[in-house]
Amino acid sequence: MKLMPVTAKKPIGRATKLPILLGTALIMGISLGSQAGAQSNDAEKLIKGMADYVTGQKTLSITYDSDIEVITSKLQKIQFTSSGQVQLSRPDKLRATRTGGYRDVEIVFDGKMLTVNNKDGKDYAQIEVAGTTEELIDVLRENHGVVAPGADLLLTNVFNVMMNDVVEAAVIGKGVIDGVECDHLAFRNMETDWQIWIESGANPIPRKYVITSKGIAEAPQYTLRIKEWKTDVAPDAFTFKADPSFKKIALGEMSDIDEVPQGTTKAGEKK
């Protein structure tokens, strides 16, 4: 569009400027809205690529570090760090370990039996749970209150689960995790903000995952960093052999095996 010169003798007043400003704002809004839509689509494509890659692996062996932040009764933010390993053979075998400053725990699932091995307490418990690893994750969450934030990454419907209730998605840019270049994505829903760093290139491995709880005062975070990612698992990885010195007990009798020591946090106070 060709702009014509202004020849009016009167200075351009506020009333004349207002339509110009509104027009500029409208153009900017359309531009920013289009960029946001493109960003959202790009973020979803990258998550879908990661999901397809991860679910395509029939066996997995990964090592990880995790950080969980809690808020004390004095509104002090404290972080607890653990390390561990996850071995998976789809559809129904899982071994996971978590070692921190307060707990050393292992779970083993062979498709029929779940074993929770409390190395600190020198005891273990077993319950019959027939089904897939995904059904196991549901049983642990619904019946025993065990919630593993990073467990979403193991599900075959990981894309649908992670994108459920997402209201905003964006590609932030690039990042480097342990020397590996990654695509940095950010997502929002009503209760949490979460970020993920996915390895760039032919192997879109999730390298870092951060969940921020917006509904809790001080917005504590959970961070998962995947260190090693392999696709081979030893055949006997899902066979549990009890330490002869350990005592077998009922699962309900087992002491607290959470990675956060009892008495550290107050009840989650809503904003």
Can you annotate each of these PLM segments?
Residues Q39-L46, K74, N117-E181, A242-P244, ...:
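Flexible, processing/modification-adjacent segments and terminal tails
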Residues L32-A38:
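Sec/Tat signal peptide C-region and signal peptidase I cleavage site
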Residues G13, V54, W197-I198:
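Conserved short hydrophobic patches within well-ordered secondary structure
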Residues S73, V105-F109, N118, Q126-V129, ...:
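A short, polar/proline- and glycine-enriched secondary-structure boundary/capping micro-motif
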Residues M1-T16:
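N-terminal secretory signal peptides that target proteins for export/translocation
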Residues P19-S31:
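Bacterial N-terminal signal peptides
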Residues N41-D123:
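N-terminal mature ectodomain segment of secretory-pathway/periplasmic proteins
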Residues A38-N41, D65, T115, V167-S255:
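Gly/Pro-enriched, hydrophobic low-complexity segments
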